Regions:
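Active-site loop segments of alpha/beta catalytic cores
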Residues: 1-209
């Protein structure tokens, strides 16, 4: 069973913007114009996320995933200055509960080395980064999850099967790999392709039945 929570930047952006945003103008303006206040908000988010995750672990969660849907909109310098410390605190304190932590940052190709610094056990990555590059840059320090483009599921089932197997094979040299999409499943995704995907993934590798 997988527990989850939103990451500090994503939750802060929803609080400040009031909705999804393309450019996060209000959030970034607040972060740049009132950095101390922004940091206090982020710390408060972490303070409240920790007991929320603890309750999920107590209820039986075997692992926890932290979702930063919008964190990739930050450049590497800003992510290091504003997000590295609070996200690391969230990761480390959750690991102390005895469960592994998966960290997902959408659009993370420019942040990989920083994400490793958080100490997360697994990095969940989107489809924009080559698996071999991700493995090389993280130097065997983390396992991976994800990487398949959700739009793939709109292709014919046989193509979906091929792409799933290709993705799994691409991570053969990683310390570990959890198959998943590189982002959330899209509305109107064809059921037959979804079924083909999971039948392929759940079949023991090398099996022909």
């Amino acid at each position: 069973m997988l527990g989850f929570c939103g990451a500090p930047f994503t939750l802060a952006s929803y609080m400040i913007e009031g909705q999804s945003s393309r450019n996060y103008e209000n959030t970034k303006a607040f972060m740049l114009g009132q950095p101390a206040a922004f940091d206090r908000l982020v710390d408060r988010i972490v303070d409240n996320s920790l007991p929320y995750l603890a309750m999920q672990v107590e209820a039986g969660a075997d692992a926890v995933q932290i979702f930063d849907s919008w964190g990739g909109s930050l450049d590497a310098r800003t992510w290091r200055e504003r997000m590295l410390k609070p996200v690391t605190r969230l990761v480390k304190n959750t690991q102390e509960l005895g469960v592994p932590v998966i960290l997902y940052v959408n659009g993370c190709s420019h942040l990989l080395e920083l994400l490793v610094e958080t100490g997360a056990d697994v990095l969940s990555i989107d489809w924009r980064i080559d698996p071999a590059e991700a493995i090389r840059r993280t130097e065997g320090k983390v396992a991976f999850q994800g990487n398949l483009d959700p739009v793939t599921l709109f292709a014919p089932p046989e193509v979906v099967q091929q792409e799933a197997l290709r993705t799994i094979a691409a991570f053969k040299d990683a310390p570990g790999y959890i198959f998943n999409l590189g982002s959330g499943i899209l509305p109107k995704t064809p059921l037959e392709s979804t079924t083909a995907l999971w039948e392929t993934v759940l079949k023991p590798q090398g099996s022909t039945n």
